[in-house]
Amino acid sequence: MRTSQYLLSTLKETPADAEVISHQLMLRAGMIRKLASGLYTWLPTGVRVLKKVENIVREEMNNAGAIEVLMPVVQPSELWQESGRWEQYGPELLRIADRGDRPFVLGPTHEEVITDLIRNELSSYKQLPLNFYQIQTKFRDEVRPRFGVMRSREFLMKDAYSFHTSQESLQETYDAMYAAYSKIFSRMGLDFRAVQADTGSIGGSASHEFQVLAQSGEDDVVFSDTSDYAANIELAEAIAPKEPRAAATQEMTLVDTPNAKTIAELVEQFNLPIEKTVKTLLVKAVEGSSFPLVALLVRGDHELNEVKAEKLPQVASPLTFATEEEIRAVVKAGPGSLGPVNMPIPVVIDRTVAAMSDFAAGANIDGKHYFGINWDRDVATPEIADIRNVVAGDPSPDGQGTLLIKRGIEVGHIFQLGTKYSEALKASVQGEDGRNQILTMGCYGIGVTRVVAAAIEQNYDERGIVWPDAIAPFQVAILPMNMHKSFRVQELAEKLYSELRAQGIEVLLDDRKERPGVMFADMELIGIPHTIVLGDRNLDNDDIEYKYRRNGEKQLIKTGDIVDYLVKQIKG
């Protein structure tokens, strides 16, 4: 490819609305342009990277025995009503109507469509197991699209769905997909972790996320410092303290705290250790409960884990925090003065709180706290559950080592769905015993566009993107200095361009009438791994300057050796 016949579209300045580095660099490198909130046009450089990612995904899915299909983006509402997700999915599901006012959705996912296909196409257990995948556009009406293609409304996704007649068969395919995903992200040169995860709105039982480690990540990834244990923080178990609860040394005292409405203010004003404080959060109770709210207690320096809390049988789903008005109607005090003593609604305390003594908490009276609270003396020990986020230094749930926490970007997710969708849509085959058998399902997703952004978050420097070789838009950049004035430089540039292309190498020849500084800046911004610079001064000595983008090292290579050298660097 020649720059004179290509849309480079690089920008010198960083757009003001680009928050994270991947969004900034994708705009500056001419990979994407914003059309509307959460909607992006992919420009040629971006498409080249996207296709590289797609090809790796497709190769490994095919190698794992999956079969490619292509399903419609627009889906009839009847399927979503049949599965029960028409009401459950929420406002992210974009509902539309055709000219006959028939309702449809723009698909955020394709469980319903593939299950409908399979229930009509398969009839016998002898046809199973089967695993189908597609690389297709998805649409989710995000309330706040941000971070460029990291959280956009329209995106490209590889989604796969497997069908089985036994849990054992599902487990085999699940393990094969786990291995395929590991190969996919390894081939792309990404630093990632496969972690245990919550199944969320997709449903099902077992689940793993594939997280690319990056400071800009939206997820907290938890892993042991000595074992293979890894989990999303939503799922990581907080082990109960091993030490028995210390004996009480203080009497419970009612203290005026008119200006302490948060744990931070309480700690600062009364010089309390934060580990001796408890915060109380009120959430809505499950429908049909005799109480409107449930009180959840965690230590002052810990955070409530909303995924764990939502799984409590007495808590409404989705988890909904009570408003101040709802709190005052039940407790007669504001949110900053809540605690377990004389709490008139059910209470659930975290395991760490259960091990505390002589602690401070709200008195359920505005502007007052109790200090020196002790369980079973001042208030009965309520229900105990794991409802907090783990913190760095906590013991690993597998009993090996302590936990580390890093930020991650979710780029893949695999689920064991079980029979959730096949039961709802009555997808069955004739079993070995001649009777109808409901199918067991798995589903496996990769955010293809998100992978591109995640790769940039791991691979950049002050000059631009530093692509892993496998997904770079071009493999080699040829920069001929003063090409339009030097016949020797022009002739050699054309010769090398042809020879490298003949070797199957993707080359970008910068044949613009531009200053050398602009040419260098653009190639480094785009992130092409290998650059060769042709100039009269070096050619006087039969030399070509070679630069490797990742480490910035330069070396002079003889003109006659440069093609073989590049082929060896790229193909090994």
UniProtKB/Swiss-Prot annotation:
One of its GO terms (biological process) is prolyl-tRNA aminoacylation. The keyword Cell cycle does not apply. It is an enzyme of class 6 (ligase). It catalyses: tRNA(Pro) + L-proline + ATP = L-prolyl-tRNA(Pro) + AMP + diphosphate. It holds the Pfam family tRNA_edit. Its EC number is 6.1.1.15. Homodimer. Consists of three domains: the N-terminal catalytic domain, the editing domain and the C-terminal anticodon-binding domain. Catalyzes the attachment of proline to tRNA(Pro) in a two-step reaction: proline is first activated by ATP to form Pro-AMP and then transferred to the acceptor end of tRNA(Pro). As ProRS can inadvertently accommodate and process non-cognate amino acids such as alanine and cysteine, to avoid such errors it has two additional distinct editing activities against alanine. One activity is designated as 'pretransfer' editing and involves the tRNA(Pro)-independent hydrolysis of activated Ala-AMP. This is Proline--tRNA ligase.
